Amino acid sequence: MKTRCFCLAAFSGILTTLAIPNEIKETGYSILGFVAYVPLFIALNKLEDKKALMGLTVFYFIIANSLQNFWLGFFHAFGWITFIGVIIGYIPYSLTLGYFLYYSLKSFKNKTMSITMLFTFYDYSRSIGFLAYPWGLAAFTVNNFNNLIQIADIFGVFFVSFAVYFLNSGIADFLIHKNKTNLLNIAFPTLLITASFTYGMIKKIELKNLLAKEIDSLNIAAIQLNTDPWLPGNDKKGIRDSIEITEQALKENPKIEFVIWSEGVLTYPFSKEDQHFKSSDLHNELKNFIKEHKIPFAIGAPSNLDKAIGIQQNSIYMVEPNLNITNIYSKIFLVPFAEKIPFYEYKFVRNFFLKNFRILGQIEGNKIEILKLKKFKFAPLICYDDAFPELSRFYKTQGANILVNFSNDSWSKTNSAEWQHFVVAKFRSIENGIKTIRATNSGITATINEYGETIKKLETFKKGYLLSTVKLSPTFTTIYEKIGDSFIHILVMMFLITTLRFQFMEDKNQLLSSSVVKIKV
């Protein structure tokens, strides 16, 4: 029995990997999202031993996380540390999930809902805190069903995860028991999925006229470099190539009003070139290029560099044609075990990473910056920032009307990594009802509309430029913008109340039983 259950869990690990963007199909097989967790949930329902159930839960996530995040192993010289760190770092999370699953499945009658709620909590829990890594959420397994995921503008991405888990858990329960009562466990989640699809279709009809209006427009060039400037010897090449590609874009459209270069194009702070850069001539060429074309640039470069203690911030500079820097935004969310290195405050740890991997540690930014141009108010997000719904939502509440993501995922060397990141960006547009522009080093450079649909994009791992006349439509307030992840908080409260109520009833029954025994005696 145990061997069969572990095989089922491994099968789910493969199915969930195929459902999201992967190396076989870049967009993923989203149809699998509706059944990918079924083998796992059947196995969880079958196991009655506590250690076996907890072990199965950990085993599944090791399989799934390894298959879905293998590209972390390519993260520069210490990718293996990043990959192993992420896999091992989430074992305590899956152990905790397994622990709660055991007692919930043992105690509660509605196993379908118990599994659904606990797996949704798992998705949320690994999206917060020091080890936050919100990748591979259940919601992403159905990302190609655009009408379905529109419901994220009400309850957020975790509600979509809930719906996916609910359907999978219902199917698993029905396949185990196969009776009319358990048919309801499929009926309710199917109704929820159908209602979400219907909402998405109606939403697009209702917003069509509003989004057809135009308040302002802006000609934008997003430059895709396809060279990692942070690799040895690539720093100068990165600048030269970026200038060359930008010149090509300006030849095609001389009316460009805003140029966006990706994350980390410069390997030195833009405002301190003489102190940090070996070739001031090349940097002067860049400055003259900006002044000559009289166009504002957004450029990825480090800031607050301190080589003495080995730290810097990953930043975006908003540079005016006269070279004034109007904004410097620094990345707020850092990747655990890659940018956010445990114990980096100790000198021997800093020296180890600097000596062996030529890596400077990063410190988080602590404030948002809105880049203003005409009537556009851009919300800059650097790479991993866009994986956190609360940041994009906060930008929107502060008046931002378009998201712009600067990313360098070229180190991943895989299409699956680029497309997985792209899926994340789609949800931020849906949740907040605003467009997203992605300017990336190697993919996916694109413009995304308010529904999370791709307007234009470039191919991955190819040099190029994306020219877009971005239309600014009237903004509208989404329910998610107002309530955030309240759905999760309500779900947690419901689970706690149910658990406490069950515990109270158990204690009451035990008390009554002991009283009956005493009376008989």
UniProtKB/Swiss-Prot annotation:
The keyword Nucleotide-binding does not apply. It comes from the Bacteria. The keyword Transmembrane applies. The active site is at 263 (proton acceptor), 331, 383 (nucleophile). It is a multi-pass membrane protein. One of its GO terms (biological process) is lipoprotein biosynthetic process. Pathway: Protein modification; lipoprotein biosynthesis (N-acyl transfer). Residues 218-472 form the CN hydrolase domain. Coiled coil: none annotated. It is found in: Cell inner membrane. Its EC number is 2.3.1.269. The chain crosses the membrane at residues 24-44, 71-91, 128-148, 151-171, 182-202. GO terms for cellular component: plasma membrane. It holds the Pfam family LNT_N. CDD domains: ALP_N-acyl_transferase. GO terms for molecular function: N-acyltransferase activity. It is an enzyme of class 2 (transferase). Keywords: Acyltransferase, Cell inner membrane, Cell membrane, Membrane, Transferase, Transmembrane, Transmembrane helix. Catalyzes the phospholipid dependent N-acylation of the N-terminal cysteine of apolipoprotein, the last step in lipoprotein maturation. Belongs to the CN hydrolase family. Apolipoprotein N-acyltransferase subfamily. PANTHER family: APOLIPOPROTEIN N-ACYLTRANSFERASE. This is Apolipoprotein N-acyltransferase. It comes from Borreliella burgdorferi (strain ATCC 35210 / DSM 4680 / CIP 102532 / B31). The gene is lnt.
